């Protein structure tokens, strides 16, 4: 198993602060070395985004993770609009080589019709399964995940993991991908996903569980001479 945890994180310049707040939250809690790779569309030289239905810039590039890891070892993929409240080692320790991926298998109908930037928030099978993934990058089923292959596939095919068997999809408990504004507020959460909108956006500044995001954001500003004016 890897000595360093590789974490690939969705990055969209329009909410760059979300990426940095998330990585800050992981760094603060982690008891093992971590290595971040931002999924920045500008730096993916062998991949050209051809899909036109994405609500953010990493909605399809996340499926490049095994390719980016040279089809070796394991990696975590996480959307950028998250905050980690627990040691990432505990998630890392859930890896099971009999699976190609491991995800939280959400089963819900959304309560909210629209999300950030006015995007429609529609229901579809396996919604939000792909927002947090433990990737077994060397699993044989992933060998087809080349940049060219991903560019040609539909969102439904990719986000439902249709290139692998259902038996190859392991399950992680919901506390590792807790959906703010969709699930109730509670104390024992490991990772919050602000899937409707990150509290960096004005309309979600005081939304459910926003306190945790603001705390990570302010911690990320340590060393900034104007931080005291933002507290």
Where are these regions (language model features)?
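A glycosyltransferase accessory/donor-loop signature
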Residues: 2-5, 11, 32, 36-40, ...
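Alpha-helix N-cap/loop-to-helix initiation residues
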Residues: 15-16, 84
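Short, acidic, metal-binding catalytic loop of nucleotide-sugar glycosyltransferases
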Residues: 25-33
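Active-site-proximal specificity loops/subdomain of glycosyltransferases
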Residues: 35-68
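A short acidic, often aromatic-flanked loop/helix-cap motif at beta-alpha or helix-coil junctions
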Residues: 42-47, 109-111, 177-181
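GT-A fold catalytic core of metal-dependent nucleotide-sugar glycosyltransferases
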Residues: 61-111, 134, 141
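Conserved catalytic core of nucleotide-sugar-dependent glycosyltransferases
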Residues: 94-158
